[in-house]
């Protein structure tokens, strides 16, 4: 392996000056210092020439006139727009200003109205259907953007979507919910009694057993132990608490399906029918009178009654209980029901005989003519006799019917006067009785009977004077047949769907 000798620059310069070293003849020229100096000078000279040529070209270009600078294309505007090279993508920026000067501000995307003063290019997001710009002072609505924010809809559109999908908060719709509640109550009432007879004047209910209990019956049975036997009168101070607990007020159904809320005379007394108590079913509105008591309240004893009649009773037709559908077994509920009716009318039966057991075949029914809108005509029982010979009501053959009771009922049936007393505590002057031919008794109904009882005194606790007896609500019975829409109870005058 041969040894490599490395020479430094100083060694090479020393050897070049040595007489022992001879210059080869074919040595390249560029190695010599003179050649290198000459090459350097040549490059400098070429650079100067190139610079001079560049200056000449620029001077010639500045004197050149372009086609854009003709007088027809000159734009009068800010200095930025007055140069021919002030364009973007081959389109003049001043084009929009020309359109504005001509009044064409509705030129679609190219107009400043829709681009918010920004320049329009192919890469711009203004005017594109898929635009998702972060903000814009002008709202360009399109279907795609609305679909992206469908969950953020406000107002009626959002509410209707939630109601259709049963999502979101519950929005109250009183009309629809009330109609649905009416249909439910009508269906439950139809199931509770298959033999219910509904007339415009009188509502009579039979105690037919039901396989499915309604919602109101379930609610009335749920709190029997807590509020059993509490009547409405005890809430307004008409009777003591002990009397209210011992008294069971029968359920009263008014025409039109509207139960009395506060035991008003105008809603409770007119055309009232008392149904026989049943051990299987109870009235839908029993909770308003029995304090949410179920059918068990019919088993209580005979209530305590005051001696004075109540002035809140008028034109009451007392009918015997209809025949229940539980068979031909004898029952002793009739006398007890009669005692309850007397208790509601403010009378106390003079006799204290026990309840007789009456066969079901001996109990007559109430025949009602629905076509008569003013007053329901009731058939006379076969046992009715003139005032000289007082006979007991049908079904109460063993009950001693006193003369006071007969006089009291005759005074209710033969009166044709109407007087409206003021509420307790509002006035001490008794209103005058006003005669109205519209509300007189129908022909052939108890006509010719004289009132055998004198006007009773006011019951304890009433501060006003006793008006002319009997009391009447002051409006014709035809008003009962009108539909009442102000109460939250279903209208049972029409058959359920």
From Swiss-Prot:
Question: What processes does the entry annotate via GO biological process terms?
Answer: mRNA catabolic process; negative regulation of cytoplasmic translation
Q: List the disulfide bonds.
A: none
Compositionally biased region (Polar residues): 367-385
Please report the name of this protein according to its UniProt entry: Uncharacterized protein C14G10.04
InterPro entries from the entry?
Answer: Eap1
The taxonomy runs: Eukaryota, Fungi, Dikarya, Ascomycota, Taphrinomycotina
Q: Which UniProt keywords apply?
A: Cytoplasm, Nucleus, Phosphoprotein
| GO cellular component terms, A-Z | cytoplasm; cytosol; nucleus
Organism of origin is Schizosaccharomyces pombe (strain 972 / ATCC 24843)
- Localisation per UniProt entry: Cytoplasm; Nucleus
